[in-house]
Structures are given as C-alpha cells and as structure tokens.
C-alpha cells in the first residue's frame, strides 16, 4: 500500500513540474541568465517525476520516500506570484533553505591551439545525495528593491564527483557554506567558503596526513624537501572561496515560501594541495521559507 501510494504521488505531479520549469526558466531569461535557463529547462523537465510541495513531502512516510529520489529534490512552489513586489520589505528568518543542482560543468582548456577555456558538460557519478537542505539563515528586502541573503547553518555541503568527456573524474565539495550576498531580487551575488574535500586526518596511500601520519614518503626521507615532492608531503586543508548568484522567480506572501534559480562557481578538490583546483559551475533551483 505504501509503495502504491508513493507511485500515485509521483504520478500526480508529473504534469505540474513542467509548468514550474517553464515559469522558472522564463524568469531566468528575463534577468539575463539565458545560458543557465537553457540547462535548467532540459534538466527540470527530464527529472520532473518526483516534484512535490513542502506539505506533500512532510506527509510522506519513510517507505514512500525510500528509493524514490524525492529526498534529493527541493519542494515545488505551486501557489504564489511572479510579481516580486508582493514580497514586503523587512528582515526575515530563512528556514528550510534547499538547493537542488540540475547541471554541473567543469572549466577545461580548449583542445584546439589558441582556443579559449570553456565550461564543458559532465556526467554525474554521485548517487542522489548532492542536494543541500535544511539550511537556515537570514533574508532582507529593502524598500528600494535591494535584497540580502546569508546562510548560517544546515546541511550545506555534499561530496560530489563528475566525469569529463575524456574520462577524467573531478571530485568537489558542493557547498554554499556561509554565503553572504547582496543585490536585488533578480540577482543576489556573493561569496561563500569551500572547505577542503578531505580533512587533516586523512592519510594518503603513503601514510602522509595533515595532522597525523608520516611527514614524508618513508622510502625517500632524504628528498622530503625537494620541490617536486614538497606539495605531496605538505598537506593543505585551507578553505577556498566560491561565488554564487541567486535569482528569485516566485514568492507566496501567504505561506512565506520563495523559490528561484541559482548559479555558482567554486573550486574542485585539490588533493590536499597536491594539484591545482578546477572551476566547477553549478546551476539549479532553490527554495526557502521566510519567517
């Protein structure tokens, strides 16, 4: 019975999600994010089966959610308006902040001589565990149309791996940790921290770590300070920085729900400082509740 109910719930929203995708994409195009909108359109329509509202998700049992992919999606905002002026000026508490990626691209050098670097499409290798959820923070709206968004706490990072067309796999910690952005409701821009993909206690295959393990490769103690080996011996866990822009597409003044699209660029894993990071561009949807 639980499985049948879950299937019915998913089937009931298949017609609703494409409408939501169209509305969000049109809004993104309006604010000059045509490239992100094109990627979002394809991804959202293709993955529309599990879209549910916040109340519908809260009403599901564990067995209905298990194995369905619903846990990796953000709630749908079906009611409300695209007229952002309906959102009254003031300071709000941001709750149930959710970010659902729909596209991952990696900046790569051109294969042609003299070509420019560009973001290339990737194949997602991670299971459905990359959505950020249950985050909290603050949201401010000014009478002049200005807006501020800050993220404070929650499930704000997720280990993710993608594969490039050539087969190379790129690991990164998808996050918007401590995001602090300002702008307008059409585009709230800011920076965030990107913690190290691995912690200081992680040991590499030769037993070297940041806070534990060997100081150098045990077979080469005399060459521990050699330049070509130093970056492998000295482990760096310093947090890096990323940037993101959030665009509000729809608000519901009655329930306090808000939703839109986002785009972020962040560095990939550096193997504890042993290799330079790659730029990862993530686009997708976001949802939150204003209190």
Swiss-Prot record:
GO BP of this protein: photosystem II assembly; photosystem II stabilization
Localization in the cell: Plastid, Chloroplast thylakoid membrane
Transit peptide, residue positions per record: 1-52
Keyword Ribosomal protein found: no
One GO cellular component, as annotated: photosystem II oxygen evolving complex
Pfam families in alphabetical order: MSP (PF01716)
SUPFAM superfamilies named in the record: OMPA-like (SSF56925)
Keywords: Chloroplast, Manganese, Membrane, Photosynthesis, Photosystem II, Plastid, Thylakoid, Transit peptide
Membrane-traversing stretches: none
InterPro entries: OMP/PagP_b-brl (IPR011250), PsbO (IPR002628)
Plastid is among the record's keywords: yes
UniProt superkingdom: Eukaryota
One Gene Ontology term of the molecular function aspect: oxygen evolving activity
The protein's role, per its UniProt record: Stabilizes the manganese cluster which is the primary site of water splitting.
PANTHER family recorded: OXYGEN-EVOLVING ENHANCER PROTEIN 1-2, CHLOROPLASTIC (PTHR34058)
Membership in a protein family: Belongs to the PsbO family.
Protein name per the record: Oxygen-evolving enhancer protein 1, chloroplastic
The species this protein was found in: Chlamydomonas reinhardtii (Chlamydomonas smithii)
């Amino acid at each position: 019975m639980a499985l049948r109910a879950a299937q019915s719930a998913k089937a009931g929203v298949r017609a609703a999600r494409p409408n939501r995708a169209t509305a969000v994409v049109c809004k993104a195009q309006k604010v000059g994010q045509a490239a992100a909108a094109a990627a979002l359109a394809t991804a959202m329509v293709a993955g529309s089966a599990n879209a549910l509202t916040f109340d519908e998700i809260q009403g599901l049992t564990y067995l209905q959610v298990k194995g369905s992919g619903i846990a990796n999606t953000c709630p749908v905002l079906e009611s409300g308006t695209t007229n952002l002026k309906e959102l009254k000026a003031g300071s709000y508490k941001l709750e149930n902040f959710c970010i659902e990626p729909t596209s991952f691209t990696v900046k790569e050098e051109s294969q042609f001589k003299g070509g420019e670097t560009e973001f290339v499409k990737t194949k997602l290798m991670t299971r459905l565990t990359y959505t950020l959820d249950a985050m909290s923070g603050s949201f401010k709206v000014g009478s002049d149309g200005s807006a501020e968004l800050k993220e404070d706490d929650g499930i704000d990072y997720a280990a993710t791996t993608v594969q490039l067309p050539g087969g190379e796999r790129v690991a990164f910690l998808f996050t918007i940790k401590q995001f602090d952005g300002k702008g307008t409701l059409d585009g709230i821009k800011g920076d965030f921290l990107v913690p190290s993909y691995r912690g200081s206690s992680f040991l590499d295959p030769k037993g070297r770590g940041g806070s534990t393990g060997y100081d150098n490769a045990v077979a080469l103690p005399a060459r521990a300070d050699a330049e070509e080996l130093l970056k492998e011996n000295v482990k760096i866990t310093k947090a890096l920085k990323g940037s993101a822009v959030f665009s509000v597409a729809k608000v519901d003044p009655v329930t306090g729900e808000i939703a839109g699209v986002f785009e972020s660029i962040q560095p990939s894993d550096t193997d504890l400082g042993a290799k330079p990071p790659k730029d990862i561009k993530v686009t997708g949807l976001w949802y939150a509740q204003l209190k």
